[in-house]
Amino acid sequence: MIQSTEFFWWKFELVFPPDVEESFLWFLNMAGIKSYAIERSPDNLQDQTLMVWLPSHEWLKKDREEFENSLLALNKAFREDVLNTKWEKIIDEDWSSSWKKFWKADPVGSKILILPSWLELPDIYSNRIVIKLDPGSAFGTGSHPTTRLCLEDLERNPPLGKKVVDIGCGSGVLGIAAIKLGAKEVRAIDIDSLAVRATSENIVLNNLSQKQLSVSLGSIENLANQLNPLSADLLICNTLSPVIKELAPYFFKLTHSYSRLCLSGLLVAQVEDITNFLSILGWELIDSYSSDNWALIRLCRNHP
């Protein structure tokens, strides 16, 4: 008896909230999975759909079950709600091109537009500041609430002529936005080589020079030594509260007396604690903003 060798894909779909997107992308990257897309709508920022195409001959039932359970467990670490999942057998679908149709132009605030690199600029957004990104990397493209909070804050407080430092740059979207909103120069840094590569690629996509936006691999301590005595006017850091606490002792060395901090990646419930912690280090809260359960805080040095 001759067994069928028909090739097909297992298409996995999962509806999820945006605050776990970057964790899912990290998991997919660690698993070596590149055939995925995220369907989102600017009109509904609360739900988006992760779609993953898995070759049938490599992913048996047991492997698929482990894959699904890993994603559900990762979600549970952040929130309690149960996610909807679906498996579908797809015959000869060319995911390498079809996944692109699920990405759309994404307006942020009143001025910014995140535009997937292969799309034409829609006429309706022709007056916006366009940031081109390639969603094929292991980093988000601006849909996470904390990233949007940072972009909206840059829009509210454009860094005209300022020197900016972006700690933990990811895709580079915040540094690119800073330049397009008038910053003189941006120094970006990340401890993840994939982030450095993604940022470098997105710098090219946006026709920026290394003089405008430079990115390097390394720690905040490395950056502090590189910048000294050049101080940043604005320091942006979009990461988790425990990480901010680890990085905070270096903030003074990277800044000057009239610099500002823009910190996000915080839960609303953590704002009081992190603000008190930074106050001990000499920083004073100026403003705070929130979206869903996430928050952004702006601080200045506490002058006696």
From Swiss-Prot:
Gene Ontology molecular functions: protein-lysine N-methyltransferase activity
Keyword Chloroplast: no
Record carries keyword Cytoplasm: yes
Gene3D superfamilies per UniProt: Vaccinia Virus protein VP39
Coarse class of the protein's main subcellular location: cytoplasm
Domain of life assignment: Bacteria
Protein EC: 2.1.1.-
UniProt xrefs under InterPro entries: Ribosomal_L11_MeTrfase_PrmA, Ribosomal_PrmA_MeTrfase, SAM-dependent_MTases_sf
GO cellular component: cytoplasm
Example GO BP: methylation
Reactions accelerated catalytically: L-lysyl-[protein] + 3 S-adenosyl-L-methionine = N(6),N(6),N(6)-trimethyl-L-lysyl-[protein] + 3 S-adenosyl-L-homocysteine + 3 H(+)
Keywords, comma-separated and alphabetical: Cytoplasm, Methyltransferase, S-adenosyl-L-methionine, Transferase
The protein's role, per its UniProt record: Methylates ribosomal protein L11.
Family stated for the protein in its record: Belongs to the methyltransferase superfamily. PrmA family.
Protein name (Swiss-Prot/TrEMBL): Ribosomal protein L11 methyltransferase
Provenance organism: Prochlorococcus marinus (strain SARG / CCMP1375 / SS120)
